[in-house]
Amino acid sequence: MSTFWSGYIALLTLGTIVALFWLIFATRKGESAGTTDQTMGHAFDGIEEYDNPLPRWWFLLFIGTLVFGILYLVLYPGLGNWKGVLPGYEGGWTQEKQWEREVAQADEKYGPIFAKYAAMSVEEVAQDPQAVKMGARLFANYCSICHGSDAKGSLGFPNLADQDWRWGGDAASIKTSILNGRIAAMPAWGQAIGEEGVKNVAAFVRKDLAGLPLPEGTDADLSAGKNVYAQTCAVCHGQGGEGMAALGAPKLNSAAGWIYGSSLGQLQQTIRHGRNGQMPAQQQYLGDDKVHLLAAYVYSLSQKPEQLANQ
């Protein structure tokens, strides 16, 4: 801000405060004998306005408000280029400096705790009850909005509490997913295989791979669907529908991991138009130490107690 505008703002602000002080004292009336008997000549419905001075507490409230304003402008920036003299902030208070100060205080308090767990493997951290509680709180703050408070997911968001993992369920894969995120793309096959191909493949996947019954009256050729699957789908999902973690291709021989639904219509929609899912990378926002705890918590959700004990 230029010197002119800084001075203009400071002069206008301070001038307003001085003017308010003058106005309050100039219009103040003191107590006088017989004051309560004098009226202003205003009356309505038997109610008259008396010529009494402002109550003392009210007058002092005005003064206190102006004094508070002056103190605030001394401590905080508010008069042009004036930075304020609030203790603890070199060069004046700003919201960025306050945030940095709070982060530094949090790091000083919790840094040793995070460092302790960062030196342990994810599998070891998953066996520590205190660490798991910390991870659960982090999960509730940062992950539950998509994956649910119970980590069982919802339509379009995977269940993190079962054994079905698109990108791998080992500790390293889970941590990588949280740190770097994942981008999953299921291409649309509607134009390539046609509407009949979509219906046939969907029926084949649901009945022959996942073992789910088809709705009564379903008109589909399972043999033709198997051929189309082998030509267009098996390269990612596997010949037997076992999936491929390297590509994030889900298992098709179990409906447990079908996050977009398992009905015949939902399968057809997925094959026809494809799907695009994204897990945002959290490293920049949470940092390595918090992600380490989160990974341990998520890892613990899909492990039985005896599995954790054998890590």
Curated annotation (Swiss-Prot):
GO terms for biological process: oxidative phosphorylation; proton transmembrane transport. Binds 2 heme C groups per subunit. PROSITE patterns: CYTC. SUPFAM superfamilies: Cytochrome c (SSF46626). It is a multi-pass membrane protein. Signal peptide: none annotated. Heme c 2 binds at residues 186, 233, 236-237. InterPro entries: CcoP_N (IPR032858), CcoP_N_sf (IPR038414), Cyt_c-like_dom (IPR009056), Cyt_c-like_dom_sf (IPR036909), Cyt_c_oxidase_cbb3_su3 (IPR004678), Cytochrome_c_Oxidase_Subunit (IPR050597). Component of the cbb3-type cytochrome c oxidase at least composed of CcoN, CcoO, CcoQ and CcoP. This is Cbb3-type cytochrome c oxidase subunit CcoP1.
